[in-house]
Amino acid sequence: MLTPEDKAAIVAEYATSEGDTGSPEVQVALLTHRITYLTEHFKSHIHDNHSRTGLLRLVSRRRKLLDYLHKKNAQRYFDLIKKLGLRK
């Protein structure tokens, strides 16, 4: 799970300015970390369908934020997906 120390490290790495916690980059990075955690969780808990629904919501929210960022600033979008190792 995401500890406060992990969250602070992710926020510090992806923040666009001091104290930035709401930029799309930070939000996408936090969602990506949670998605990765849940993906690993499903390798040992195959029948956890309730959490799978939550995973689909997280993926959808991340997709919407990435679409927003691509529409507003394509260069920041491409830098972020490259840094996170997402597929595009």
UniProtKB/Swiss-Prot annotation:
Protein's name in the database: Small ribosomal subunit protein uS15
InterPro entries named in the record? Ribosomal_uS15, Ribosomal_uS15_bac-type, uS15_NS1_RNA-bd_sf
- Supply the Pfam families for this chain: Ribosomal_S15 (PF00312)
**Family stated for the protein in its record:** Belongs to the universal ribosomal protein uS15 family.
Biological process (GO) annotations held by this record are: translation
HAMAP family linked: Ribosomal_uS15_B
Keyword list, A-Z:
Ribonucleoprotein, Ribosomal protein, RNA-binding, rRNA-binding
Q: Which GO terms describe its molecular function?
A: rRNA binding; structural constituent of ribosome
GO CC field: cytosolic small ribosomal subunit
